[in-house]
Amino acid sequence: MELSCSEVPLYGQKTVYAKFGKNVYLPEDAEFYFVYGGSHQRHVVIADRVQDNVLQSSIPGHWLQETVTVSVCLCSEGYSPVTMGSGSVTYVDNMACRLARLLVTQADRLTACSHQTLLTPFALTVEALPALDEELVLALTQLELPLGWTVLGNSSLEVSLHRESLLHLAVRWALPKLFHFLLCLPGGVKALKLPNEEATTPLDLALQGGHSTLVEDITNFQGSHSPGFSRLRLNEEATLQFVHSSETLTLTVNHTAEHLLEADIKLFRKYFWDRAFLVKALEQEAKTEKATMPSGAAETEEEVRNLESGRSPSEEEEDAKSIKSQVDGPSEHEDQDRLPLDRSFDGLKKSKHVPASLAAGQLSDVLNGGDEVYANCMVIDQVGDLDINYINLEGLSTHTSPESGRSMLGPQACMHTLPPDTSPCGRPLIENSEGTLDAAASQSFVTPSSSRTSNLNLSFGLHGFEKEQSHLKKRSSSLDALVADSEGEGGSEPPICYAVGSQSSPRTGLPSGDELDSFETNTEPDCNISRTESLSLSSTLHSKESLLSGIRSRSYSCSSPKISSGKSRLVRDFTVCSTSEEQRSYSFQEPPGEKRIQEEEWDEYVIPAKSESEKYKVSRTFSFLMNRMTSPRNKSKMKNKDTKEKEKMNRHQFVPGTFSGVLQCSGCDKTLLGKESLQCANCKANTHKGCKDAVPPCTKKFQEKYNKNKPQSILGSSSVRDVPAPGLSLHPSSSMPIGLPAGRKEFAAQVHPLSRSVPGTTLESFRRAVTSLESEGDSWRSRSHSDELFQSMGSSPSTESFMMEDVVDSSLWIDLSSDAQEFEAESWSLVVDPSFCSRQEKDVIKRQDVIFELMQTEVHHIQTLLIMSEVFRKGMKEELQLDHSTVDKIFPCLDELLETHRHFFFSMKERRQESCAGSDRNFVINQIGDILVQQFSEENASKMKRIYGEFCSHHKEAMSLFKELQQNKKFQNFIKIRNSNLLARRRGIPECILLVTQRITKYPVLVERILQYTKERTEEHRDLCKALGLIKDMIAAVDLKVSEYEKNQKWLEILNKIENKTYTKLKNGHVFRKQALLSQERALLHDGLVYWKTATGRFKDILALLLTDVLLFLQEKDQKYIFAAVDQKPSVISLQKLIAREVANEERGMFLISASSAGPEMYEIHTNSKEERNNWMRRIQQAVESCPEEEGGRTSESDEERRKAEARVAKIQQCQEILSNQDQQICTYLEEKLHIYAELGELSGFEDVHLEPHLLIKPDPGEPPQAASLLAAALREAESLQVAVKASKMGDVSQSSEESPGGTVLMDTPSTQDVPASPTASLVTEGTEGRGCWDVDPGLQGVVTDLAVSDAGEKVEYRSFSGSSQSEIIQAIQNLTRLLYSLQAALTIQDSHIEIHKLVLQQRESLAPSHSFRGGPLQDQEKSRYLEKQREELANIHKLQHQFQQEQRRWHRTCDQQQREQEAQESWLQARERECQSQEELLLRHRSELDHQLQEYQQSLERLREGQRMVERERQKMRVQQGLLGHCKHSRQRSLPAVFSPGSKEVTELNRAESLCHENSFFINEAFGHMSLNTSNKPNPSGVPWDAHPLEGSHFDLARTSESPTELKIDISQPPDVNSELWTTGPGHQRPALQENSKESYKNVADLDSFQSESSSPQDSNQRGPQPQTLTTEAKLSLPMAAGHGGDAGDGAEENILYL
């Protein structure tokens, strides 16, 4: 079962869905309940079936944060609730719950700012609160408000004139639902008008906040509203709550441990189905709460006064309007308040079957002053359409017109009726001491809310009765007399029944005449057909003629279930209740005989006339009705009807059936075969095709009829359902409480008969009389309870004795159902999450599936045991009253079986819970073997052997007893009903017994499958292997016990069949009789049919019985056994001197030779086959060997010889014990050595090498161990070791030369004391074992070295192999060591056994002469043959030892050779290692040299790179010089001398440009030649230097010099006139000068390189230094200066001319 939600808030009210598996079908006609079980509370809620396997319900509120168990219970008629599944839901405390608790506690401490301060702890804002509106209301609904609490706070506090209330807070938060809910709480109306400290009411706050919805609701509010829920406290522990919003009715019970689940569900059903009673109880609860409310919580002072006077404010008005309120109906707002609750309760009835006679309209009419009340079913003939007056208890009359009567036929008519304790004028009826009913003068107090709620009384039943109209037609309660009254009238309208309160209401509005005729009401449903429920029936019949206005009425106590063909009459129930709802007593009075009116006279008294609407009333008594019902005409009718009903009931709907398992035919009780079998589609009865006519009636149809006819008690009788009635006796003059719980099986058995003067002996007889109208017409005769119980089973409705509550232990079944629900999946992989399953390995999944199957089948087995125990055995003991010993023969050891398997399952369940990984759903059980070992070993194993041995032994006996009991009709009916039980799951007793006997055979299969997917060499694998062996031993022991029991039973059967007078004569003349076989020591060992060959060659059929001391031959005669008499030979042969030999050339014959002291005798016996002959010979030989000694055998022995023999035996036993102890000690030492080797291996770092520190054999004193298998295993391990060593050798040869060297270690050479017979083996074995310590730490290495030196005196260096091969070698050595040690232990034990056998043989040989007289030559020959066989076996043992020693020596030689090869290889490897080391050192030196060379190379490379850079710079310089030379050649023709004035700004600007561009740059612009002389002397007006103009154009060239250029300073400080004179000279003057100096210029160009390393001379610097205007240039050419006028260069006044 899966639940749709796992967490809910504390207030609940969430819809939950429960989905079951596909194989689970939920019946449509059953009721389902959700049971929420917590630590202190239990909630019961009804559930709806929405699909075939889905249920829907509502989660109730809970008061504690915890995880509760959710159980789904199924209820069907006649059965106890059955748990279908279980789950869990966690209740959590959310924000709405915390805020609701805060509002309740802070109600009297609110201020104007509380709407903000209260939200601070929750980090909420006012804008987020509307989402919590509905949740807050639900949380407040769930809370239990403190005593005296109101909306204004504690009622004990004085209410101030101005204070903040919860209504103000709800308006400020804008929560309309919370506001309406608070209005319904105590003090809500007063808080609505109460202003706060700011003098504002909630209405003012709503207007200010703009909450139009709240403003409208407050404005239209005219009174209190329903709070949305109703709560009823039944007692201190039980509470009912109905929530209108979710339409949920919840029963909450405290102290769940003290309540049975079944009782709680019954209590819930009582109130759920009896709604009028529920509403009345809710009204009383409301009145109680109102009456106990303190005055401080009252709304006004007037209400307080009314409260003290015991009347509500509306009662005075209702007193004046009583008639009008009944006819006109309730007010508008009352209708609005009632309708939701009506619809809510009607909603609860959806898809539910309402009982057909749930309730009947109840009226109280007091005739002649109201002194007498008629409680029978009144049939009032109303003819005419005139208005009818009805007199109520107060004398008020209700006038009902036809129109108003018709208007009340609908659902609104249900709201016009109030129960008597809520009506202002109603008076409850109290029983006086004389048994009559008087009207009490007390009045009931009604509050406005309770009066509105009470009006729902009638409406609850209407919805159900409208659904069951067709069903009611079939069950109308009219007698044959009513048919006579109705003849000739029109057809009747469909009957409509009203459900009213349990007490009659005098204010009930009634329809008019025609409508009254269409009504038919039955107040006694229990008298109709079914007897399962009892009703408080009151009837006080008086025949008075002074009736009010002579109204003619008829009164009946019961009615025939016939459909009235005429016009039905209105049947009114005048049942009145006493003030005590727990007990109701009425009296049956028999009027005088002369006032009885026969049926034929009824018509003359019943004359329909409109004017006679108020005339005479005639009452009938029970005696008349009894006579009427048993009339001959009715009897004949009932017989014909019974015949048809029985034929109809017997009809099955057979279809071809398919069955799983062994089933029996319901008709002949034989095994069913699939092809010839039929199955009823209704009751699932199985039968052969030829036996279908003999099958009992269809139980399903009977069950449906039973459910249909089973009545529900009317509203007035609900409160007395569960009142126990231990003893019931009816007396004609006394009143009797007859309320009984429905379905109680004790009822019929505890009814005592009445006196003979009463026609109906008991109330049960009366009810049976009513039921007999369908089943049997003569059921008035007295019958014993047991006869009626079993004879009517299956054919009569009186099956309530078996339709009773189940006897299954509820808590036990609930626990088991939850376990079964947990293991209902098909496999483990379907239980866990798919993601979790996908992460597991394939073998793990398969292993978990098998473990899950083991646990699942264990749960099913426990269920089968529970079915046998609680369904069948308990019912057979308690219901059938069978003898306990008889029942225990059918179910032997059942309690012990159940206890054992439950303990086993709980152990596995605990392991499953411990293995959970992250969540309860995901689990992986890693260990299950230890639980299996614990279950099938020691005490548990012996217990299971005993229990299963006894159970399986008595299987046949139980089945035969069961078949014998099935001959009883009572037992057959019981078994059929129990088989149809839901808990039985269609399993009968034979199936259950067979399943139990087969259970132990399932364990080996499951354990083998678990073992298949378990890793070997693990503790789990060993445990599983051990558990498997234990299980097989247990099964073998059970089989042996079953075989022994069967043989014992067979021996007893044979003894019973042996003729008492038979006898036979022995060889010694003694007579052997049957009585001699009755010895307790004799047991049957083997039996079978053989053939005794006579002297004439004929064969006689003989029954041969092999007992513990004799062999019997019996033959059958007249179905009895007698001693066989063949050839005058005795048919009793003693086993003391019996020898069995084969017959030559006859494979099926054998000779039995008896060498008795009286004389030998030989028998020739033949069997059916050779195998049977060999089996007989083997069993005879075993019996002879184990045969006890003959009584007279020891008489001839002397006491001294006996004492000597005993002393020898004692000495042999002592020697055997000593040898066993020594063997045990040797085995212990060997295991200790293995343990030490394992520890050394772990310390040496071989984690992957595993060694079990246990020997492979156990010292068993019973049988010596077999050494051949150990020897073969040792040889195989030696071969694997040889292969591993060779593989490692080849790997080492091909190993790389760069492998790092390893160290050396010394081998451990242990002492040679371990194997005395073969010291070399011990030396080699332990020497190889010592190699496991090859890389130990220095400290341990020293210890090993010392040990080796001290033991062997030599050192052996060892070189390690590669990692993988070395681990394989070490592992092989470890395994070989273990095998050799085990072999050594086996040989030691075998030697001990050999010595013991030698002593035994010597003892026998010494005793042989003294016992020679007992045997003869044949027995001596047999002994010699046995000794010869022993010698052969001993020789075989010595031969095996010799072979083992040879193999051991050969293996030692092989080991020595391998060791020498390994030592040689080790020395070669060491030499190779030294060579590698020298080569490594040489390589290191070469590497250092190469590093040095590399460093020098890098330095040279750096220098080379620097030289390359220098060459590149020189190459660049050359390119520049070449470019400059070409440029000079190109510009020489066009260059002109430029004369600069010394003080000109152009020169200054040119200087500045020089300094900006480069220190050693000189720019020559040929544009100077074109410049005007006028502009050369003018300053630069714009202030822009010359170099700012386009100097980078094509007319400018840059000449770069070397690092040490020659400075040439030109003095241009000539006057302006000179400059202008020079510039004014035309080109013709300058051109010749250039041509003359061109050669010198080219000559200077050729000398360009001479200026790279020269610097300017000091003379030039001195001459050119102090000039005011200078031009600095850098040039590689030495340009001569020509004076324009031939002046000196040193003169500053000379004009400097530069030629380019």
Curated annotation (Swiss-Prot):
GO BP annotation list: central nervous system neuron axonogenesis; neurofilament cytoskeleton organization
Modification type Phosphoserine: residues: 312, 314, 478, 623, 1535, 1604
Segments for region (Mediates cytoplasmic retention and interaction with MAPK8IP1): 1563-1576
Assembly information from the UniProt record: Homooligomer; forms some cytoplasmic aggregates. Forms a complex with MAPK8 and MAPK8IP1. Interacts with RHOA. Interacts with microtubules. Interacts with YWHAE and YWHAH. Interacts with PTK2/FAK1. Interacts with NEFL. Interacts with CTNND2; prevents interaction with RHOA.
Signal peptide (UniProt feature, chain positions): none
Record's GO cellular component terms: cytoplasm; plasma membrane
Chief localisation class: cytoplasm
Keyword hit for Cell membrane: yes
Regions annotated as coiled coil: 1421-1522
Compositional bias per record (Low complexity), positions renumbered to this chain: 1647-1663
Induction (free text): Up-regulated in B-lymphocytes upon CD40 stimulation. Up-regulated by PTK2B/PYK2 (at protein level).
Region Disordered, residue ranges: 288-343, 483-532, 1184-1205, 1289-1328, 1602-1700
Domain called DH: residue spans: 846-1041
Consequence when changing residue 1568 to A: Alters interaction with MAPK8IP1
Localisation: Cytoplasm; Cell membrane
The protein's name in its UniProt record: Rho guanine nucleotide exchange factor 28
